[in-house]
Regions:
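Two-component/phosphorelay signaling modules centered on CheY-like receiver
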Residues: 31, 43-67
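… and, occasionally, acidic/histidine-rich disordered N-termini of signaling adaptors
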Residues: 164-342, 394-412
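Acidic, metal-coordinating helix/loop segments flanking the phosphotransfer/catalytic sites
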Residues: 50, 65-83
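Acidic catalytic/metal-coordinating carboxylates
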Residues: 68, 94-97, 118
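Active-site residues of response regulator receiver
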Residues: 87, 115
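C-terminal catalytic subdomain
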Residues: 280, 331-343, 348-412
Length: 412
């Protein structure tokens, strides 16, 4: 829609609504020049807008021009812009259809509608559809108004893009958490002569703790608990990798020591600096009435029927500390069917409400000993309740994971 016959002073205009722009808002702080695309078919209106931009923008900017929708599309295919100043009525497109097409082609740009007085209602509709603002041509179309509008539009759009990015990240984290939750075992009732109960409560959306139950080729039950240092997506990814390595190697005939030695070598190749993994792996053989374990900086506790406690821990360091470390499988001759194995990460033993007094391994083990005649899931509940009560109203700062393994004499 050409307006070249109009006098500059007669170009219709309007002011920004106070609710959408306020002089009290801080100016946009950007180190790069603002890239602007001016889409206007009237040479007179285009000239007036350029004069207003030159006088109204305090910072540097680059300006691209187009007199039709197709020309604007051509510009957007070659350059990235921060703001589009858009006349909705062009020779090859009219009304909201113009906005929709430009918005699709420039999804990351702020669009400001430059409206004539006869189509202000359409401009308002465009704002409802996602345009950052609109200006009605006329006497109030001033350099100050246009400069302020451009700055505020870029600022609001930047916030909008950040919110979209954060929402995307949040969705990815939720998806990762859902996948991570599915990795925890759900086969606790499938092992003869053994009652199993395990749980992981992450401090953040994606935790670095894990536990697993694996049946090996010889029929033995392999129980694993691990704790990757740190929190967040990095440790969570390392947790998934650690679990995958252990599961893959458990399908072989390697000993526990050989499995963990190999896992350590594989993880050391991928381990980020300052990350490490504490790990405890136990193997139960009901047919041979045997218990063995391999420890990488992580203890386990064997609770006897009479309440005596044996701490199971080797001198090997956590995984990722020394890629050449040789881990050893240790037998437990004191083991008898009917004994109980308690495994937990330091998120439980280091529960605290003031960062001065910590729950400690001793109190956790005492809780297990006290409830040793209860079902495994009841013992597990009491351990988590103990940690939560000790933590009080303080924020949980570390992942909490525990596994209780109760063995039963054959036939029970």
């Amino acid at each position: 829609m050409s307006r070249s016959s109009l006098d500059l002073d007669s170009i219709p205009c309007g002011a920004i609504e106070p609710a959408r722009a306020s002089l009290s808002e801080p100016p946009l702080n950007t180190a790069l020049p603002i890239a602007i695309l001016l889409v206007e078919d009237s040479p007179t209106a285009r000239f007036h807008a350029k004069v207003c931009l030159k006088k109204g923008l305090s910072g540097e900017y680059s300006l691209h021009e187009a007199d039709s929708l197709s020309a604007a599309m051509g510009v957007l295919s070659e350059v990235s812009v921060d703001v589009v100043l858009l006349d909705l009525n062009l020779p090859d497109s009219h009304g909201l259809d113009t906005f929709r097409k430009l918005a699709q082609a420039s999804s990351n740009a702020a669009i400001v509608i430059i409206s004539g007085d006869t189509d202000e209602r359409t401009a308002v509709s465009a704002v409802r559809l996602g345009a950052q603002d609109y200006i009605v041509k006329g006497d109030e179309f001033t350099p100050e108004l246009l400069g302020r509008t451009v700055h505020f539009a870029v600022e609001r759009n930047a916030r909008h893009l950040l919110e979209k990015e954060l929402a995307s990240v949040r969705h990815d984290l939720e998806l990762a958490d859902m996948i991570q939750q599915r990795l925890y075992p759900h086969n606790e009732s499938q092992f003869p002569n053994v009652s199993l109960a395990g749980r992981c409560s992450s401090a953040t959306q994606n935790g670095g703790d894990f536990y697993d139950y694996i049946t090996r080729q010889d029929g033995s039950l392999m129980v694993v608990i691990g704790d990757v240092s740190g929190h967040g997506i990095g440790p969570a990814m390392m947790m998934v990798e650690s679990r995958a390595f252990v599961r893959a190697l458990a399908s072989t005939q390697m000993s526990l020591g050989e499995i963990i030695t190999q896992v350590n070598q594989l993880l050391s190749d991928d381990m980020q600096q300052q990350l490490f993994v504490t790990l405890f792996v136990a193997s139960f053989s009901a047919s041979r009435n045997q218990l063995s374990f391999c420890s990488a900086g992580h203890p386990g506790y064997l609770v006897k029927n009479d309440g005596r406690v044996l701490q199971l821990q080797a001198e090997n360091p956590p995984l990722g500390v020394n890629p050449k470390e040789c881990f050893v499988e240790n037998s437990v001759p004191e083991f008898e069917q009917g004994d109980l194995l308690a495994l937990f990460t330091d998120g439980i033993s280091e529960a605290t409400c003031d960062h001065q007094d910590f729950l400690g391994d001793r109190r956790v083990v005492e809780e297990v000993v006290t409830g040793r005649t209860l079902p495994a899931n009841r013992i597990l509940d009491s351990v988590f309740t103990l940690a939560q009560n000790f933590n009080g109203d303080a924020i949980q700062h570390d992942d909490r994971t525990a596994v209780i393994v109760k063995t039963h004499p054959s036939g029970q």
